[in-house]
């Protein structure tokens, strides 16, 4: 939501693609729409918007992706497109300041700590096959 505000202020045209299990789970749709952001909804059961997942509801044309969510969704999303992107990873964090190395992800630059080096990484630097 905050990123959409910044993109709009910079004269960009963001599209928010939001995925949920059911129509009852949908949130933030009205907030994005109030900003003037085109908002696309996908629900796994088809009760609202596109039936399926976020990757099934992607616009045909876009320049870049900025995504957050569960690792399986992020993997599928990044595998589907060759567009550049920024990915915010979720990880269980034992200490929260990088000492325990419990939240590492494998990248083209070696192991990185999600809590200290991230949580945002470029889509291209994440070694997706090595992620949980």
Task: Give residue ranges: language-model regions.
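Short Fe-S-cluster ligation motifs
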Residues: 28, 34, 106-132
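Local cysteine-cluster metal-coordination motifs and their immediate loop/turn environment
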Residues: 1-2, 71-72, 90-119
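Nucleotide-activated chemistry modules centered on ATP-dependent adenylation/adenylyltransferase
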Residues: 58, 74-76, 88, 97-98, ...
């Amino acid at each position: 939501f905050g990123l959409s505000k910044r993109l709009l202020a910079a004269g960009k045209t963001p599209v928010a693609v939001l995925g949920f299990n059911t129509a009852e789970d949908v949130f933030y749709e009205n907030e994005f729409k109030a900003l003037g952001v085109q908002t696309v909804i996908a629900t796994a059961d088809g009760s609202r918007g596109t039936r399926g997942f976020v990757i099934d509801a992607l616009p045909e044309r876009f320049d870049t992706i900025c995504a957050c969510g569960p690792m399986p969704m992020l993997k599928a999303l990044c595998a589907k497109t060759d567009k550049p992107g920024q990915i915010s990873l979720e990880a269980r964090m034992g200490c929260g300041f990088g000492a325990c190395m419990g939240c590492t992800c494998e990248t083209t630059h070696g192991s990185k700590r999600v809590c200290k080096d991230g949580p945002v990484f470029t889509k291209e630097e994440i070694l997706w096959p090595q992620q949980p």
